[in-house]
Amino acid sequence: MRVDYLKKLGPGLLFAGAAIGVSHLVQSTRAGADYGWGLLWALIIVNLFKYPFFQYGPRFALATKKSLLEGYFKMGKIYLWIYFIINIATMFTIQSAVTIVTASLASKVFGITPDLIIWSLIVTSICFSILLIGKYNLLDRIIKWIILALTLSSITAFLIAFTNNTSSLSFTQILPEGNKLIFLIAFMGWMPAPLDISIWHSLWTIEKNKNSNKLNTKEGIDDFNIGYLTTVVLGICFMGLGALVMFNSNLEFSNKGGAFADQLINLYTSTLGEHFYIFITVAALTTMFSTTLTTLDASPRAMEKTSQLLFPKNKSFNYLFWIIILSIGTSSIFIFLLSEMGKLVEIATVLSFITAPFYAFLNYRLVISNQMPEKFKPNKFMRILSVSGIIFLLSFTIGYLIKI
């Protein structure tokens, strides 16, 4: 692959960095720990049905030179107001959730202090500094190295676990029943990521094309496909780690992300040896740091654009304003509401999950509307997959609401 083409890669890797987080390290691994390879079908099918809606982010941005948010606004101001309210309701707790898992892993890897509040503030400060000093261009460069380290360490950790496995492997697929069905619904809802990340991707694509390494539509979709394939492969790797190292271990696993990640690392090293510790810790830490960094960039970027469209006369609601607000809000949750973190994350998770059909419908409607140039509209296969995906997401959302 040519060096100049590698320089053009960016938004798709940022997507991967944002997507490969709690959904992979915690939920995919948990699926493997509890069901072995039994939920592999769910991982594959949900990635298939969500694919078009994520892809429409860069497709629309490159074809129209506008973000999905601008498309929503043109379809109707009400859609943007809904997004604004949902984002305000979820962005602080989601940022806090990914940061606390990163802090837990950093505490384990670097020691210094076991205080998660201190580590959370350190992680937030590092990410804030990277984004404030280097802005998008530094983020674009850093994420390529993070994703490379993440991919190599995760695949290596999986291969080590696979080659050291002495138990027979079962690929019998399972459909959980009763209360266990709730885990399946949540797993599929967050794999590989909530659908509003398609909005972030469209904004990153617009930002990427402000520099000299501009993407055309084909290159942009190729860039996305590389990022998306990475999320799928690593989803399988983390499920495999759970299946190979944690399944049938007769241990009770924590429902808290940081504690579960700690259990994974401890069990991995105790099963395979201390000399393999570095591979699983690098995989886990880079997984969560990439999510923390990209999320801290994306939410303020999305809120800046939303504010520009909804409040055109107010110029103060810019990127700097929102990243400061998000950083302060996140830090405040660590300091004052850490004991309520579980409930706050649950609320944010439910809101993000039940809005998936909403974003799927909006993205599909947008790319077949007259806002989209005819030659860039999805083909027949993508349209069929999109309609099937909307039905699929709607069905699981209704199923989730019935069960809770």
Q: Over which residues does each language-model region extend?
A:
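Transmembrane alpha-helical segments of multi-pass small-molecule transport proteins
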Residues: 12, 84, 109-132, 148-159, ...
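Juxtamembrane transmembrane-helix boundary signature
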Residues: 15, 42-71, 82-94
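Extracellular loop-to-transmembrane helix junctions
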Residues: 30-55, 70-74, 78-80, 182, ...
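Hydrophobic transmembrane alpha-helices that form the core helical bundles
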Residues: 63, 80-111, 120, 288-307, ...
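Membrane-interface loop-to-helix entry segments
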Residues: 122, 130-161, 175-178, 346-356, ...
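Hydrophobic alpha-helical segments and their helix-loop junctions in multi-pass secondary transporters
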Residues: 148-175, 184-203, 359-374, 396-404
